[in-house]
Amino acid sequence: MSNGDIWVGTRKGGLYTFDANLQSKMTNQYFHSNIYAIAEDRQGRMWTGTRGNGLKVGDTWYYNTPSDPTSLSDNNVFAIYRDRKDRMWVGTFGGGLELAEPTSDGKYKFRHFFQQTFGMRMVRVIEEDENGMVWVGTSEGICIFHPDSLIADGDNYHLFSYTNGKFCSNEIKCIYRDTKGRMWIGTSGSGLNLCTPQDDYHSLKYEHYGTSEGLVNDVIQSILGDKKGNLWVATEYGISKFNPSTHSFENYFFSSYTLGNVY
């Protein structure tokens, strides 16, 4: 967060705060559902997304209300992102992408995007590249757009999926932007992919790394880089450390049981 604190949400509903030295702070909170996303807005308020229990902004909860077209489109909130203009984007798993728009009473209404297909409504992750383009990982592939353009026209985005032949997978689990600005995509079943937009984002070049290249498992849960430029790739069966310079993997297991190696 902006003050250096680290916020950790758990699947048992705990929200814990640590300082930069990993010392616990007495601001722990508990929810009645899994916490899947945490972000901070420009006012310093915490946005917390849950599985099945909606979105909390500061002290206010937002839920799906079928009779209100400006309410949250789904109560499963898996991703929250603050863009370069401090706009807050919310990814729901079932209702697509949301733009939170402030109202005169200090609360929010929600504008809905990516309602076209069932898979596009399943949003897991939101990330921004070095050009200010936003990448959204869904169950229908990768949607890439410029925020200003999408707000002006809800159909102004680029979709790269297995279905349309522009990517190796539909199921996008995670997106990571490394220190060199490169975009790495983790998929469910198609491993790790280094993606490079071409032709003004009309096409996507990707380099694939799967089990045949040394990755421990092709179902990726998360990606994180270290200070040496390595990528740590958490999968459904172990963790891989990937060196982008040598294209080599080192694999790690921490349990003799299969379920103990799911990350």
Which residues are covered by each model-predicted region?
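Carboxylate-rich, polar loop motifs that coordinate divalent cations or form catalytic acidic clusters
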Residues: 1-263
